[in-house]
């Protein structure tokens, strides 16, 4: 049966059509906003998956090139693996939905969001986030809390709801807010050093705007939502829970109060082995239940410690940051490096500078763009002392890399100010919480060490949260470590400078965050950020004045746009010849700006002269040292600039009368000639005679 519903959001129609397609899916629907259309399909397995201790939710964000009228490039001519942007959007959809499923739900759930049509003014990822929530609400899957998502911009201090492409380009804020009718579920922001009070107001603006979409989803649920199935939820057997708690709770409590991480982990392994041996005969096939009970006991102890005793596992105050150390210039042959250590979390970031032509070209569903600043994040297994196969970057690594990249985007100098492509790579050497924010700090150190003139240093911090079961009590903590992240309710990451916020990412494991919690986290994060910046500036207080000896130098020359073809030459012949002869790298912009990159100044200067000679015009009245290229009975052809020849008529070869051209010059001779005129057909007429007369005149004056 076909169902249709629409509402008005920010002056544009939000429409939902359900029941027309995907008849075999649990729920299939089309959701549109303007001319942007996303198809959402959700399905769940009939029974829980056996042998797992997590909720197997799978979110897929599929981009289709036909949505923007493109045919995929490459030999295959079809979409391949998900792009980094697709992965980031899928993660953003997952984060607000996952906490709202019933605890203990182990059925496989898959949400597939397929982008079918894109109008650049209306972001498909925002639409997909709303569609995913709505499709789950309309299905019989046990998901009953609608989540709405909006985009918020800020232009001249005024907030804009779901900004258009033109508005996004003007905006100093790119904020995504996901919320239920009561609380904020997820935040993602990139900003141009926005003050804390303005960011808090923007989040509040987004939360209020979400309420219309929540009401829209609730209306759809009432009108044509399916009746929800009663799920089979996982819970350890009561007798196992009782026996393990009686046997081990006091021991686990004692262990969790040990502040030294290594000793605590050793004692935990010992007690787990004791528990396993104690119940091996009584519960031989219930190892998963026993592990779940032990985990629950650990969690209970840590949460009570924080919420009721106001004590942290490592003994710190709630607003206290772990010991920090910073170092730079660690790797001799790299262009810049920085090492940031906070407690047992340690990240080394390395900077590489390259030509503008090395910028990454992004040809997705949006407007084609190039990215000259990149940040990549690697999280190897040794960072947590584990042994795992080394493979390509996973979704988490891509997400953390993008967050740290976003934090520094507003601080990177313009192409005109610093004509380089910049790549940062953060290597996580040790992980005990908040490695993405340590990457922000490491990136700042590495950029300044490389001599990149960033506007200001940036730092990042992760805030945590512990709440009571009814959410009536909450405690916000600064600089969360592994245990607090693992057993806590929130990971609230804030990056920025002394001036303001540049990036935010918020995940929660509970049914949302209160306004008080958000305000407290943002304000406390500022205090922490300023403290960290002091430590970083003590290590290196400004970008180095000189680039590394091993970094290439960039030189710029401007040419007329109509000379670009001349510089490139047929099939790139001319520019490739310059590159081969000098060993430089050359990039040409459409406006006539030419970038020359070389580690050797002499090579760069030779290339610049060759480019200048190729592209500058021959001027009447100028004297040139030219080379004779051809001799005829009426004169000699002389190349005055590369590829530019003129004729010296026989009558203009010498002061005295010339009978034969060969009596005066030969092919290959270099002679001084003056440009007398350029005719309507562009032919250049030269005179050696005028130069000789001028020389005679000068000699007479000197005498």
Curated annotation (Swiss-Prot):
Class in the EC hierarchy, top level:
transferase
Known cofactor(s): Mg(2+)
Which GO terms of type biological process are on file? mRNA catabolic process; RNA processing
- Cross-referenced Gene3D superfamilies, in alphabetical order? GHMP Kinase, N-terminal domain, K Homology domain, type 1, Nucleic acid-binding proteins
Q: What is its main location?
A: cytoplasm
Against InterPro entries, the record matches this protein to: ExoRNase_PH_dom1, ExoRNase_PH_dom2, ExoRNase_PH_dom2_sf, KH_dom, KH_dom_type_1, KH_dom_type_1_sf, NA-bd_OB-fold, PNPase
**Source superkingdom:** Bacteria
Q: Where in the cell is it found?
A: Cytoplasm
> Which segments constitute the S1 motif domain?
621-689
Q: In this protein, which residues make up the domain named KH?
A: 552-611
> What residue intervals traverse the membrane?
none
List the Pfam families: KH_1, PNPase, RNase_PH, RNase_PH_C, S1
Keywords (A to Z) from UniProt: Cytoplasm, Magnesium, Metal-binding, Nucleotidyltransferase, RNA-binding, Transferase
Question: Which reaction is the catalytic activity of this chain?
Answer: RNA(n+1) + phosphate = RNA(n) + a ribonucleoside 5'-diphosphate
Give the matching SMART domains.
KH, S1
Residues binding Mg(2+): 485, 491
EC number(s) given by UniProt: 2.7.7.8
Q: What is this protein called?
A: Polyribonucleotide nucleotidyltransferase
The source organism is: Clostridium acetobutylicum (strain ATCC 824 / DSM 792 / JCM 1419 / IAM 19013 / LMG 5710 / NBRC 13948 / NRRL B-527 / VKM B-1787 / 2291 / W)
Q: What is the lineage of its organism?
A: Bacteria, Bacillati, Bacillota, Clostridia, Eubacteriales
């Amino acid at each position: 049966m076909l169902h249709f519903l629409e509402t008005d959001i920010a002056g544009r129609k939000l429409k939902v059509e359900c029941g027309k397609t995907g008849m075999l899916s649990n729920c299939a629907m089309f959701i549109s906003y303007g001319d942007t259309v996303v198809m959402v399909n959700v399905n769940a397995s009939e029974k829980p998956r056996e042998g797992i201790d997590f909720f197997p939710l799978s979110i897929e964000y599929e981009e289709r090139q036909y949505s923007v009228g493109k045919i995929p490039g490459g030999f295959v001519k079809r979409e391949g693996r998900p792009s980094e942007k697709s992965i980031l959007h899928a993660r953003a959809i997952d984060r607000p939905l996952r906490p709202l499923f019933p605890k203990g739900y182990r059925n496989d759930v898959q949400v597939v969001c397929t982008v079918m049509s894109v109008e650049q003014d209306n972001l498909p990822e925002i639409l997909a986030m709303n569609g995913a929530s709505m499709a789950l609400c309309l299905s019989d899957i046990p998901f009953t809390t609608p989540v709405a998502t909006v985009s918020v911009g800020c232009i001249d201090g005024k907030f804009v709801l779901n900004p258009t492409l033109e508005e996004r380009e003007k905006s100093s804020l790119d904020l995504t807010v996901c919320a239920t009718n009561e609380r904020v579920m997820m935040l993602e922001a990139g900003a141009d050093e926005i003050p804390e009070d303005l960011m808090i107001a923007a989040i509040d603006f987004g939360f209020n705007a979400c309420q219309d979409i929540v009401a829209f989803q609730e209306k759809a649920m009432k009108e044509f939502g399916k009746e929800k199935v009663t799920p089979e939820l996982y819970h350890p057997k009561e007798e196992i829970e009782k026996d393990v708690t009686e046997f081990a709770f006091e021991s686990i409590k004692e262990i969790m109060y040990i502040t030294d991480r290594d000793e605590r982990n050793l004692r935990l392994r010992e007690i787990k082995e004791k528990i396993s041996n104690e119940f091996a005969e009584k519960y031989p096939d219930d190892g998963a239940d026993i592990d779940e009970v032990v985990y629950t006991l650990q969690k209970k102890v840590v949460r009570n410690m924080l919420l009721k005793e106001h004590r942290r596992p490592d003994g710190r105050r709630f607003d206290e940051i772990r010991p920090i150390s910073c170092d730079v210039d660690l790797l001799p042959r790299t262009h810049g490096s920085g090492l940031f250590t906070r407690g047992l979390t340690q990240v080394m970031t390395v900077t590489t500078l390259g030509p503008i032509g090395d910028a990454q070209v992004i040809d997705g569903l949006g407007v084609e763009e190039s990215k000259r600043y990149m940040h990549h994040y690697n999280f190897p297994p040794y960072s947590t002392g584990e042994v795992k196969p080394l493979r390509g970057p996973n979704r988490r690594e891509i997400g953390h890399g993008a967050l740290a990249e976003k934090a520094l985007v507003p601080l990177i100098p313009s192409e005109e100010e610093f004509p380089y492509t910049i790549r940062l790579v953060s290597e996580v050497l040790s992980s005990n919480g908040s490695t993405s924010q340590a990457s922000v700090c490491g990136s700042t150190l590495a950029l300044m060490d490389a001599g990149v003139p960033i506007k200001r240093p940036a730092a990042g911090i992760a805030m945590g949260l512990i709440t009571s079961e009814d959410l009536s009590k909450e405690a916000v903590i600064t600089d969360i470590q592994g245990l607090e992240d693992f057993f806590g309710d929130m990971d609230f990451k804030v990056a920025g400078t002394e001036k303001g916020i540049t990036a935010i990412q918020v995940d929660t494991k509970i049914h949302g965050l209160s306004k008080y919690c958000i305000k407290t986290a943002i304000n406390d994060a500022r205090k922490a950020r300023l403290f960290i910046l002091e430590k970083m500036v003590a290590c290196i207080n400004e970008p180095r004045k000189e680039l590394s000896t091993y970094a290439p130098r960039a030189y710029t020359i401007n040419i007329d746009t109509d000379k670009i073809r001349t510089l490139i030459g047929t099939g790139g012949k001319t520019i490739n010849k310059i590159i081969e002869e000098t060993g430089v790298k050359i990039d040409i912009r459409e406006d006539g700006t030419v970038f020359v990159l070389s580690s050797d100044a002499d090579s760069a200067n030779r290339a610049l002269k060759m480019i200048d000679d190729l592209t500058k015009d021959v001027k009447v009245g100028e004297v040139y040292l030219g080379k004779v290229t051809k001799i005829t009975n009426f004169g000699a052809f002389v190349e005055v600039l590369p590829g530019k020849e003129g004729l010296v008529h026989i009558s203009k070869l010498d002061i005295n009368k010339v009978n034969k051209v060969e009596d005066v010059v030969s092919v290959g001779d270099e002679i001084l000639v003056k440009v007398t005129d350029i005719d309507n057909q562009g032919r250049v007429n030269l005179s050696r005679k005028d130069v000789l007369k001028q020389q005679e005149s000068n000699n007479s004056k000197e005498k």
